[in-house]
């Protein structure tokens, strides 16, 4: 996955370390949680319901799902059911503490030991039977519809997590999500962040299984509550200060909405249109993360805070270069080890000095052409100061270009791409190529490339958050169809204009989803807004059609 994501990153001409990390986390989360490739030997006559599968429609790649849904009137009162707790039902407190308890098996060492033993047993059985990697519990269960789950095995697995539900109930009701990290003291913020954040995905997987098991046993109200808890965890992580966290939040939110779509197929499931309408919009709020992201370079390399426009002596820059060589060498080693880039060399004072001499003309041109610094002012700086000042200024420039994708409404970006956003991106691309020297890996060729090597690919982060909202709105549209069908004799509407409640909007177009109905089957199509390059298709069947299918 890392290698494939690196290729994606390079194809996008984004060569940053964080770009790769974001693509690895987000793409693996979406694929794992939502999309299944049909097996070559699968029975094509057997339809899967409530599960995303990869497919095509008129040559276009799609994420497709078939749903069988029952008409269901709106709840009375309208907010009888909640997915995200109401403000008056929330408690001031830190949800992160509760998630850590649930993930860390706090005072549950025996259960943790038994779980490890059980997983080893299932893994060994799969090896003995020469099954493919991951083709054993609990991983194989994510492909199974609730009614087909092996109840005894699932119950055995979930019993070892039986301490979690009460903790997760409390977590969903907390107002804040904060890890209170002393990030400014960390020499490697990336390595510091990833382990704890990634563990939330496993917690969401267990919750998803817990939800489907509740559906299988007819515990619908409990399943509704679990779906809300998964979504709340995604929303919580989305408020964290790091984009890595927000992307994991996107993945968790997707797991929750997928479980919700599965739940919508049950005849006893209450209508959740208004519960979804009351959920946060946007589902994943990127404001805090983008604010912190804009100073990530200085967090990763605090020494660069000493670089500014104040004229400094040559002696200062000799000492600064010595100290910076150690910092850069540590960062380069982390980059090389993380992505198996064995050809990347380390840095020492001599190599930095050689690079400064080579990069000085490009650095001076950048400060003159982009920032408008006068020749007289530039003449007062040493070559070393000009190069390091360019790193800071280029990072500022690159961050602002990336930030544009966040402040422009997602549905209007198509028009914007032909004007201001594209011009700025083209300018940044030009300087990026000039600084990186003939397409070499940036960290190995020029210290100037540090200006954008730690800039997140914000257009893809914004798209991921929009895709999360899109999925939630798709589910809400399904609930609108169920609600309206309950009012008009169980019939599907011919147009979303006929819905008795407002049609949710597709974030990719800021319009209702595309909709077709032949009276028996309706199809919802969402715009293509994520990097998988796939549309999302949902087919809906009326109550009468389901009765015929079950006979």
Language-model segments: residues:
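N-terminal secretory signal peptides that target proteins for export/translocation
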Residues: 1-12
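Short acidic linear motifs
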Residues: 33-551
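Bacterial N-terminal signal peptides
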Residues: 19-28
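Compositionally biased, intrinsically disordered or flexible polar/acidic segments
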Residues: 2, 31-32
């Amino acid at each position: 996955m890392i290698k494939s994501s690196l290729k994606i990153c390079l194809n996008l001409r984004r060569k940053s370390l964080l770009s790769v990390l974001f693509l690895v986390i987000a793409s693996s989360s979406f694929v794992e949680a939502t999309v299944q490739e049909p097996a070559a030997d699968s029975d094509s006559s057997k339809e899967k319901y409530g599960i995303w599968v990869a497919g095509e429609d008129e040559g276009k790649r799609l994420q497709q799902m078939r749903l069988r849904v029952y008409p269901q009137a709106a709840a009375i009162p309208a907010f009888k059911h909640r997915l995200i707790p109401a403000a008056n039902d929330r408690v001031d407190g830190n949800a992160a503490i509760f998630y850590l308890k649930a993930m860390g098996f706090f005072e549950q060492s025996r259960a943790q030991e038994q779980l490890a033993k059980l997983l080893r047993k299932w893994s060994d059985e799969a090896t003995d039977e020469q099954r493919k990697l991951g083709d054993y519990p609990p991983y194989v269960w994510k492909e199974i519809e609730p009614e087909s789950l092996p109840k005894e095995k699932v119950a055995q697995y979930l019993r070892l997590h039986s301490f979690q539900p009460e903790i997760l109930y409390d977590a969903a009701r907390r107002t804040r999500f904060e890890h209170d990290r002393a990030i400014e003291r960390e020499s490697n913020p990336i390595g510091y962040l990833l382990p704890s954040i990634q563990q939330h995905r496993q917690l969401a997987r267990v919750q998803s299984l817990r939800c489907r098991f509740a559906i299988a046993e007819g515990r619908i109200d409990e399943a509704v509550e679990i779906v809300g808890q998964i979504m709340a965890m995604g929303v919580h992580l989305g408020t964290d200060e790091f984009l890595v966290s927000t992307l994991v939040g996107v993945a968790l939110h997707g797991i929750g909405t997928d479980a919700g779509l599965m739940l919508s197929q049950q005849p006893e499931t209450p209508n959740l249109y208004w519960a979804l309408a009351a959920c946060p919009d946007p589902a994943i709020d990127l404001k805090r993360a983008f604010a912190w992201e804009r100073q990530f370079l200085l967090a990763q390399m605090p020494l660069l805070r000493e670089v500014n426009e104040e004229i400094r002596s040559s002696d200062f820059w000799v000492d600064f270069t010595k100290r910076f060589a150690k910092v850069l060498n540590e960062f380069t080693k982390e980059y090389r080890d993380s992505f198996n880039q064995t050809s990347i060399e380390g840095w020492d004072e001599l190599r930095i000095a050689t690079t400064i001499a080579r990069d000085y003309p490009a650095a001076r041109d950048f400060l003159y052409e982009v920032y408008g610094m006068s020749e007289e002012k530039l003449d007062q700086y040493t070559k070393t100061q000009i190069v390091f000042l360019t790193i800071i200024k280029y990072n500022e420039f690159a961050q602002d270009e990336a930030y544009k994708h966040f402040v422009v409404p997602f549905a209007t970006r198509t028009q914007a791409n032909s004007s201001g956003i594209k011009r700025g991106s083209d300018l940044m691309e030009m300087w990026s190529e000039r600084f990186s020297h003939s397409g070499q890996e940036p960290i190995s060729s020029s210290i100037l490339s540090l200006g954008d090597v730690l800039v997140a690919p914000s257009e893809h982060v914004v798209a991921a958050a929009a895709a999360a909202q899109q999925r939630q709105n798709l589910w809400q549209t399904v609930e609108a169809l169920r609600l309206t069908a309950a009012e008009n004799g169980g019939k599907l509407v011919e147009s979303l204009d006929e819905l008795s409640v407002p049609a949710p909007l597709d974030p990719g177009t800021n319009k209702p989803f595309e909709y077709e109905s032949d009276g028996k089957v309706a199809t919802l199509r969402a715009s293509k807004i994520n990097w998988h390059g796939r549309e999302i298709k949902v087919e809906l069947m009326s109550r009468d059609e389901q009765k015929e299918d079950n006979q």
